[in-house]
Amino acid sequence: MKIQVKNKQNNSKMCFICGMENEYGLKASFFELEDDHLAGTFKPCKFHQGYPGRLHGGIASAILDEAMGRSILIEDENVWGVTIELNVKYKKPVPLNEEIMVICNLTNVGSRLFEAEGKIMLPNGEAAVIATGKYIKLSLKKITEEEFIDDQWFKVEHMDDPKEFNVPEKASR
């Protein structure tokens, strides 16, 4: 199912997941979709390896945590999710050197907490890693310094950014 992108989220300079200047990071990009899912793309390489040719499980967990924590930005761009619980199930290995998609959505939103679920999807449409998480809502200003927001939190748009995502039916539920 093709779902249109409605907004690209910001990146930072040095975050391991989304940092554009972190030479060992994933340099992931995240997109808000019209159906209120959050999709992300990344291409793991040799620096992200666990077993030969496979993404390290801790890094798979980290990108799911990042994506689920960001999913609240769809509802409120001034709120960030700080992890209080993360559950991850590994189903299939995630290959290196291929464009990989992560997709997540909010499952419960309260006044102080929210919950989300996410999946790392293989190029063939299968879910490789699935996760659920619980997060506390905090303003970015409470998490970091004002200088970070001004100097290191920015939107990076590219000509080849996707305008839509082909989300497998299994991923959107």
Stretches with model-predicted labels:
Residues 13, 17-55, 170-172:
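Catalytic strand-loop segment that frames the active site of acyl-thioester-processing enzymes
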Residues 67-101, 107:
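Hydrophobic beta-strand-centered segment that forms part of the acyl-chain substrate-binding groove
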